[in-house]
Structures are given as structure tokens and as C-alpha cells.
From Swiss-Prot:
Membrane spanning stretches: 7-29
UniProt organism field: Musophaga violacea (Violet turaco)
Similarity comment: family membership: Belongs to the ATPase protein 8 family.
One GO cellular component term noted in the UniProt record for this chain: mitochondrial membrane
Coiled coil (UniProt feature): none
Domain of life: Eukaryota
Bilayer topology: Single-pass membrane protein
Listed name of the protein: ATP synthase F(0) complex subunit 8
Amino acid sequence: MPQLNPNPWFYIMLMSWLTFSLIIQPELLSFTLTNPLSNKTSTTTRSSPWTWPWT
């Protein structure tokens, strides 16, 4: 059962995670957000219950 041999698969997994962690992730984190964060408190909207015609 060659799929149980971790030699090639472990290397591929390790290289892909290193590529993601060292190259792709810092580039993604450097982007600015399109909507800046605000300190406003979120308002909760109250909804009235639906009046069902058959009750």
C-alpha cells in the first residue's frame, strides 16, 4: 500500500504549508480593508411578531 508511505506526501504537505505561511499569508494580510472598522455600537432592531390569520 504505497499511500501509507509518508515520505513523498509529508514533503508535499510541508512545502505547501511553508509556502502558504511564508509567502502567501503576509501578502494577504497586507491588503487594506475596504470598509474601515468603526467603534460604533451596533443597534439591535426589534421586530414585532407576525400575526397569523388562522390563530
